[in-house]
Amino acid sequence: MLPSLLEVYDEPFADSSALPSLLLSKITKEDVTVALSGDGGDESFLGYNHFDLVKKPNYFLYIPYFVRSIISMLIPKFIFKHRAEKLKRILKIKNDHEFIEGIFTGYNSITLDRSLNWLSNYKNYKHLSRNNYQRTADLNIKLWLENDSNVKVDRASMAFSVEVRSPFLDYRIIEFARTLPISYRYYPGKKKRILRDVLKKYIPEEVFDQPKSGFSVPLGDWIREDLRKEMLEVLSDENLKMVHNLNIPKFKKMLNDHMDGNADYKSYIWRVYVLVKWIKNNNLDEKNYQ
């Protein structure tokens, strides 16, 4: 389905869950033409797993920053391996605002630096609320939902002429959710609380009281096994030179570490793979696409 992915999205779209979205749309079309989607529910009713992270800064931010900086320099890489970089970045967080930004820029990334300013366009948006949970939800809506989730579902469904309706994206639902106390929407161990309370009136709770699971594929294993040859051919030194401003030695090390099973860099490898394929498919070079 990789050729279909590039054709349907017509841009370097590197959310790997687009693949199962295409497959689901294909199967759905066999029975129905119009389907309902739950997109927007996690944003308004605090359902994502990373909302559990929002409370964590309250614990270690009590430790003076200079103390945490010293601790970060003492973390032994040979013990923590690829998690060492993540721990260092977390320890160097200066305040809760920076932590929330880190949820989206990825503190486990060695390819993204916290000095990146791409979030600056949304600083006013995220400060519409003083509550860290709501501010995180606002960023989810503006960055993830708008630029990823909605794009993914819309193009995957329309590729097979399936009409997807998303009732949680009704502006009245979103505005109503913002008026509810955080405790009505989230508390540890039971996310989307109010939706669960409504649903259990109609469906036995044991049916839907399950751990949250993303719409993911075994991408890491695919890269090492089924797609190994494809990956190594596409991510050759010659092709990587077409990607503007890519640190090729660092990326090649990430690729090799992943292939050897020493680290998990599947999301970063997949992004570069999709970008290279998009550049080649459109006969682009550095001068006319950057």
Predicted regions and their residues:
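Secretory-pathway/luminal and periplasmic proteins that interact with or process carbohydrate-rich
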Residues: 65, 148, 207
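Short acidic (Asp/Glu) and glycine-rich catalytic loops that position anionic groups and cofactors
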Residues: 123-124, 152-157, 172-179, 206-211, ...
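ATP-dependent adenylate-handling active sites, centered on carboxylate activation for C-N bond formation
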Residues: 1-120, 156-202, 260-263, 268, ...
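Structural motif
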Residues: 14, 127-140, 255-272
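Short amphipathic alpha-helical segments and their helix-coil junctions
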Residues: 2-5, 118-131, 244-262
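PAPS-dependent sulfotransferase catalytic core
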Residues: 203-262
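Phosphate/pyrophosphate-binding loops and the adjoining catalytic core of nucleotide-dependent enzymes
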Residues: 145
